[in-house]
Amino acid sequence: MADDDIAALVIDNGSGMCKAGFAGDDAPRAVFPSIVGRPRHQGVMVGMGQKDSYVGDEAQSKRGILTLKYPIEHGIVTNWDDMEKIWHHTFYNELRVAPEEHPVLLTEAPLNPKANREKMTQIMFETFNTPAMYVAIQAVLSLYASGRTTGIVMDSGDGVTHTVPIYEGYALPHAILRLDLAGRDLTDYLMKILTERGYSFTTTAEREIVRDIKEKLCYVALDFEQEMATAASSSSLEKSYELPDGQVITIGNERFRCPEALFQPSFLGMESCGIHETTFNSIMKCDVDIRKDLYANTVLSGGTTMYPGIADRMQKEITALAPSTMKIKIIAPPERKYSVWIGGSILALLSTFQQMWISKQEYDESGPSIVHRKCF
């Protein structure tokens, strides 16, 4: 990269939202849902300029007549054609750049299938002709954004939650744990428990309404049992929400029962540990000498950590698991929804990072598998 004036593009492809922008910016320029929508009905009016597919916000706004699909599930791309549409939309409509002129930094969840990043690499070089690219681990970027080099990141997005311990800038791969329970599962769970209240949400469009209810009204209880008792005895916790058609629904204990599944996955019929226990287990897999530093630097990142009360609850739960004298500090930066992207924006600018890019030339020589050699 001899030219200094060509900014790298940073794209954080989340399962729920795609965050994209230019390296060096302090926030992503474009944030839109990772959705591709296709019409459910036949177009009858000629000249309307109907398209056979819509991406992002446009799909969201026309959701009443579309079937919405998320091409990324649990952090893994399941539909590459749709994924290509999302990238195309990112480059040409959102950022308005020519991808063949900019290096591109992409992000990925740890412990993803190897084929996933190979295919990402292949599409970037062969379809979009990028001059260089790199795939970074999401949680590592979040730690960069928080200004630390040591800590454990609990990153929970829409599709996947993972805990990554990092010491002096090195991720410790043997201690990384991944939990396929995140925002989308909570949305589905909220759909289910609202049905018990007599509100029916079934279509892909209605799921988006429930996601909005979740984001606006849910919170994490410090003491779940006590909160349930409060909700049963008074209506102080009830909130109302107006649906797009003007109907008003009331939601009570669902407000904290929904995110409680993060701490008790058995609510979803899952046999895994909650996020607090996963974080603790991840720390316990690390060398005994560095645990103290990890407990004192537990960083939350991702949209599913945005619930009010989640940091206090994590503090309480981890304190209960850890040795009694241990100092535990949960760091929840206000911009943590975008901290992966912000970390990518920082990384792509570092002078020491410039030799890490995979160039088009290296790709042509080695093929997609080069990504495993050059990207951690």
Curated annotation (Swiss-Prot):
Record keyword Nucleotide-binding present: yes
Entry's Gene Ontology molecular function annotations: ATP binding; hydrolase activity
UniProt-listed CDD domains: ASKHA_NBD_actin (cd10224)
One GO cellular component, as annotated: plasma membrane
Pfam name, any one: Actin
Reactions mediated catalytically: ATP + H2O = ADP + phosphate + H(+)
EC primary class: hydrolase
Residues annotated as transmembrane: none
Record EC number: 3.6.4.-
Modifications after synthesis and translation: Oxidation of Met-45 and Met-48 by MICALs (mical1, mical2 or mical3) to form methionine sulfoxide promotes actin filament depolymerization. Mical1 and mical2 produce the (R)-S-oxide form. The (R)-S-oxide form is reverted by msrb1 and msrb2, which promote actin repolymerization.
This protein's UniProt keywords: ATP-binding, Cytoplasm, Cytoskeleton, Hydrolase, Methylation, Nucleotide-binding, Nucleus, Oxidation
Methionine (R)-sulfoxide PTM sites in chain numbering: 45, 48
Predominant localisation class: cytoplasm
Record InterPro entries: Actin, Actin/actin-like_CS, Actin_CS, ATPase_NBD
Compartments in which it is found: Cytoplasm, Cytoskeleton; Nucleus
Residue numbers of Tele-methylhistidine PTMs: 74
Record note on quaternary structure: Polymerization of globular actin (G-actin) leads to a structural filament (F-actin) in the form of a two-stranded helix. Each actin can bind to 4 others.
The family this protein is said to belong to: Belongs to the actin family.
Function, in words: Actin is a highly conserved protein that polymerizes to produce filaments that form cross-linked networks in the cytoplasm of cells. Actin exists in both monomeric (G-actin) and polymeric (F-actin) forms, both forms playing key functions, such as cell motility and contraction. In addition to their role in the cytoplasmic cytoskeleton, G- and F-actin also localize in the nucleus, and regulate gene transcription and motility and repair of damaged DNA.
Miscellaneous notes: In vertebrates 3 main groups of actin isoforms, alpha, beta and gamma have been identified. The alpha actins are found in muscle tissues and are a major constituent of the contractile apparatus. The beta and gamma actins coexist in most cell types as components of the cytoskeleton and as mediators of internal cell motility.
Name of the protein in its database record: Actin, cytoplasmic 1
Origin species: Xenopus borealis
Record lineage: Eukaryota, Metazoa, Chordata, Craniata, Vertebrata
Gene: actb
